[in-house]
Amino acid sequence: CPGEEGGAAKAFMARDGLWYGLDAALTWHPDDANEVLTGSSNSCIQTQYHFTGVAAHAAGDPDRGRSALDAVELMNVGVQFLREHMSDKARVHYAITDAGGRSPNVVQPRASVLYMVRSNHVAEAVELQARVDKIAQGAALMTETTVEKKFIDGLADTVTNHALERVLYRNFEALGVPSYTPEELAFADSLAGTYSGSDRAPGVGSQYDLDYAADAQARRAQAGHAMNRFLLPLYQGDAFQPGSTDVGDVSWQCPTAQIHVAAWPNGCPGHSWQNVSCGRTDTGHKAALHAGKV
């Protein structure tokens, strides 16, 4: 179903009790590796802040203007200073969704910014969200504007289930990994040539210990093609991964486990155009069908 970090479709389904009474929920996510996912995820909250000020001629009557765009910028600066005083696992992201207009010679009377806060547990995310709210109020006070906030969505952290992970791994071992045609491998190799160095994804998340990460990286380096065609060994841990998923909300209502199936080349950066380009390829379709079989 649609939505993961943004949209949060399964969170709204969880709100309505859709997952209660299920024996288990099994899911997958496209990736550059074939593996059983372990560990928890960050919870997150998305909130839209809309500032309203007073328009004025930026040169002729600047003293009469009250800039909503200034308020957004001051909020962003305030959150920047907050980052020093957050948990190491916490994250705060933003996107300015409305800068007011295209004319710089006007004091912008409106501006909006969308914020996402993340932390390892819901209670921590709620606490961090309250601090961001105060910064928004402070920005409005400094600029003599008003601010309205709108809750967009929120996601819970994931409850790990090692028993289901072991079941999925046995199935994955028995089925094997997807196979690819020479044309599919050539496409993956060409796509891998569009990113390098700092663009490459690290490949192994923070939920793994150092020895496992080193082994996984060595296996990837020996793959021979950009597509990883092996199953990573089962690793089970309880550490967190910094991303967020609405699968977390499912996991609080029924036992839940997840796998990764290789759908794009090794090291492909997350949330990139390269990720998107694989979604309608045979490689991406194979990954989805293979996940269903597992």
Task: Tell where the protein language model's regions lie, with residue ranges.
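Metal-dependent amide/peptide-bond hydrolase catalytic core
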Residues: 69, 73-294
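Histidine/acidic-residue-rich, glycine-tolerant segments that coordinate divalent metal ions
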Residues: 1-108, 118
